[in-house]
Amino acid sequence: MAATALAARTRQAVWSVWAMQGRGFGSESGDNVRSSAGAVRDAGGAFGKREQAEEERYFRARAKEQLAALKKHHENEISHHAKEIERLQKEIERHKQSIKKLKQSEDDD
């Protein structure tokens, strides 16, 4: 009789361990728990306000960095196009000089 009681206790202990492993330990998300449970911002209060302020500060800084990068990109584009315009104007002037020389040689003939 004692052996069967011991076997029953052992089975119950093993089953309890399996149940705990299946359910999980700690604050892992389960079916009935929201994924944001325990989030500081959702809790409200001073910590929630602080978290919100830090997030807003982060995103403002990120937007400022992106705008600075975009401004630099546009300045580089403008510089490139200005150089290209200058190069093409020189090319036009060179062609005009060629035409002028051809006209002069034609008039000399």
UniProtKB/Swiss-Prot annotation:
Described purpose of this protein according to its UniProt entry: Endogenous F(1)F(o)-ATPase inhibitor limiting ATP depletion when the mitochondrial membrane potential falls below a threshold and the F(1)F(o)-ATP synthase starts hydrolyzing ATP to pump protons out of the mitochondrial matrix. Required to avoid the consumption of cellular ATP when the F(1)F(o)-ATP synthase enzyme acts as an ATP hydrolase. Indirectly acts as a regulator of heme synthesis in erythroid tissues: regulates heme synthesis by modulating the mitochondrial pH and redox potential, allowing FECH to efficiently catalyze the incorporation of iron into protoporphyrin IX to produce heme.
Q: InterPro entries, alphabetically?
A: ATPase_inhibitor_mt
The name of this protein is ATPase inhibitor, mitochondrial
Q: Where in the cell is it found?
A: Mitochondrion
Return the annotated region ranges for Disordered.
26-52
Q: Key word Coiled coil present in the record?
A: yes
The entry describes its oligomerization and partners as:
Homodimer; represents the active form and is present at a pH value below 6.5. Homotetramer; represents the inactive form and is present at a pH value above 7.0.
Q: Tell me the impact of changing residue 59 to A.
A: Strongly impairs F(1)F(o)-ATP synthase-binding
Q: Which ranges of the sequence are coiled-coil?
A: 69-109
Site residues (Participates in pH sensing), renumbered to this chain: 51, 74
Is Coiled coil tagged as a keyword? yes
